[in-house]
Design a protein with these regions (language model features):
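Glycine-rich, basic loop-to-helix element that forms the pyrophosphate-binding segment
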Residues: 50-66
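Short beta-strand-to-loop acidic/aromatic patch adjacent to the donor-nucleotide binding site
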Residues: 68-79
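Conserved donor NDP-sugar-binding/catalytic core segment of glycosyltransferases
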Residues: 83-114
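Short, acidic, metal-binding catalytic loop of nucleotide-sugar glycosyltransferases
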Residues: 14-22
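Acidic helix N-cap motif at the loop->helix transition within catalytic regions
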Residues: 6-10, 34-42, 83
Length: 244
């Protein structure tokens, strides 16, 4: 988080209304100067100072500091419903063997019918195109969760470079035989600022392209698909769950 106090205030209010309270709320301050860190501290959050610019490094610092068995991540502009944390926990508790990531959709806070239409194109397009590159569904950083034990393994290969698309890069760490569950119950509303045609939009595309190049150097898309299909064929019919 960097200089996002107004959005953070709304998120903290939503987290305070959760039916299943969090063990802790960690806010990573990535060099803010607008009072965001002070706002988080006043709300009882654990604030980590991470002055080095970059989402991937800041996110990893938060994951490393987490004490709970389940790490749940969202963005400052996310607006989770009261049952959001409970839904993440339920998805892991009742998921198929090998579930390492749970994620869901995001809906832009726009007037109807634009909210549904634009969200379906933007978020749906991202999920489908990235799934083709990964050979499974990707994590959507606006609402995602993972067991801490899995992060301890994934952190050794996940990048902390400011040039990567962090949740896409994390998704590349999912191995054959591991699962990503996509659940509507963990979906959140979010700011439409990602739709702006500005420098931020260009930067996101550059990060995505860099992340694909970085990971495809290690494993080509068809190699990922082949390995995943081979792993799936060994699971048996009893595990044919359409989670990605």
């Amino acid at each position: 988080m960097r200089d996002d106090a107004p959005e953070l205030r709304g998120l903290l209010q939503a987290l305070a209304q959760q039916t299943r309270p969090a063990l802790e709320v960690i806010v990573v301050d990535n060099g803010s100067s607008d009072g965001s860190a002070e706002l988080a501290r006043a709300a009882g959050c654990t604030v980590l100072e991470h002055p080095v610019p970059g989402i991937a490094g800041a996110a990893a610092a938060g994951y490393d500091a987490a004490r709970g068995d389940l790490i749940v991540r969202c963005d400052a502009d996310s607006r989770p419903s009261p049952g959001w944390l409970a839904a993440h926990q339920h998805a892991h508790a009742h998921g198929a063997a090998g579930t390492v990531l749970v994620t869901g959709p995001g809906w832009f806070r726009l007037p109807r019918p634009w909210s549904g239409l634009v969200s379906a194109v933007y978020v749906g397009g991202y999920l489908l195109l990235t799934a083709a590159a990964l050979a499974h569904a990707p994590a959507f950083g606006t609402t995602m969760s993972m067991p801490r034990r899995w992060w301890r393994e994934a952190r050794t290969t996940a990048s902390r470079s400011p040039d990567v698309h962090d949740d896409m890069d994390l998704s590349f760490q999912v191995r054959p035989g591991e699962r990503v569950r996509v659940r509507r119950a963990v979906g959140v509303s979010m700011s439409p600022r990602a739709l702006r045609l500005d420098r931020g939009q260009l930067l996101r595309w550059r990060r995505a392209a860099y992340t694909l190049r970085r990971n495809w150097r290690r494993e080509r898309p068809w190699e990922r698909w082949r390995a995943r299909c081979a792993a799936a064929s060994g699971l048996g019919a009893g595990h044919r769950e359409h989670d990605g």
